[in-house]
């Protein structure tokens, strides 16, 4: 038996992996020490500060903006200030288009008989709903005649020689329709009363 065979067999233990050098080693050679991780106490302090900031902030701030331009209130005149309303009724107004040979709707709204306090003249004024644009504006002249509209007992047709709804006086043939026969009859009655007033004015 050789001398090599006589050597005792020793179990080799697994060598432990070397640990990385600590931060102290680096600091010895001018290296920067590793920063300590934030402790639990630091986290609590941060949360407390955030909470205090939240308590200081108003829950519902009152935001107020000053207008850039100050607008003054303007009184809009309708030219009805010096007139008295004698009669008012809801109606739909049509005008006859001679070129197209058909009736065209002019507007729906309140039709008013207005008496001027200075001249005592009575005129018809009708404004469209929502837009309030004038669709009829003329004196109820004594020569105007209301005629029944064919096929309807709640509308009238009459020729107007000078309607100024569009600015300049124009001649139109109007048809005015009401919600009921009673309103149509009442309109005729008030129309003829206004004609009598205008005869004397």
UniProtKB/Swiss-Prot annotation:
Superkingdom field: Eukaryota
Pfam families membership: Ran_BP1
Region spans: Disordered: 1-66
Gene Ontology annotations for the cellular component aspect, listed alphabetically: cytoplasm; nuclear pore; nucleus
Modified sites of kind Phosphoserine: 60
InterPro entries from the UniProt entry: PH-like_dom_sf (IPR011993), Ran_bind_dom (IPR000156), RanBP1-like (IPR045255), RanBP1_RanBD (IPR045256)
UniProt cross-references to CDD domains, sorted A to Z: RanBD_RanBP1 (cd13179)
Any single biological process term in GO: RNA export from nucleus
Location of this chain's protein in the cell: Cytoplasm; Nucleus
GO molecular-function term, one example from the UniProt record: small GTPase binding
Keywords: Cytoplasm, GTPase activation, Nucleus, Phosphoprotein, Protein transport, Transport
Main subcellular localisation: cytoplasm
Skewed-composition ranges (Basic and acidic residues): 1-17, 32-66
Family: Belongs to the RANBP1 family.
Primary role: Important for the export of protein containing nuclear export signal (NES) out of the nucleus. Stimulates the GTPase activity of GSP1 and GSP2.
Complex and partners: Interacts with GSP1 and PRP20.
Protein name: Ran-specific GTPase-activating protein 1
Species for this entry: Saccharomyces cerevisiae (strain ATCC 204508 / S288c) (Baker's yeast)
Gene name of the encoded protein: YRB1
